[in-house]
Amino acid sequence: TLNSGSAVNVIPELTELEGEVRSFNLKKAEDNFNLLANIFKCEAEKIGAKIEIDYFWDFVPYTIPESSFVFKETVRAIKKVGLEPTPKISLGGSDANSLNGRGIESINLGIGAQNPHSNDEFIYIEDLIKSAEIALELVKKD
């Protein structure tokens, strides 16, 4: 998002740029952020502009190994309700990013939403029921 100035054909006193850097790998994300920050600093210096850079990690990337307890239990629960797990990677963010970033191993489970993040998003009742069944399997004690 770029916010700059209040009139056409006028040099603004302040320009604000907001964006995000995403990667499956935290080191790559940090490297890409630092590259962008250095480009902005160099360009600001060339024209004598002042620059301030603030950042925070909203979603830290994570990978859960297939050998982990959490992964195996999730696969077990999905199979127990008659489905075949199809692990996917995503650049999207979820609570799982925050939990993993705090050392609590977790997996983001899709619930079968169709057309996610759109005005046409919906879920089939059968998929919602299956999601609840998976959740129940994950919390049950055998």
Model-identified regions with their sequence ranges:
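Short, low-order "capping/linker" segments at domain edges
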Residues: 62-77, 102
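C-terminal alpha-helix
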Residues: 134-142
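Alpha-helix N-cap and loop-to-helix initiation/capping positions
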Residues: 28-31, 66-69, 123-127
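Midchain, well-structured core segments that form catalytic/ion-binding scaffolds
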Residues: 1-45, 49-60
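C-terminal helix-coil-helix/basic helical segment that borders enzyme active sites and/or dimer interfaces
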Residues: 50-56, 82-89
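Zn-dependent metallopeptidase/amidohydrolase metal-coordination segment
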Residues: 83-134
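Alpha-helical segments within the soluble intracellular
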Residues: 44-45, 79, 100
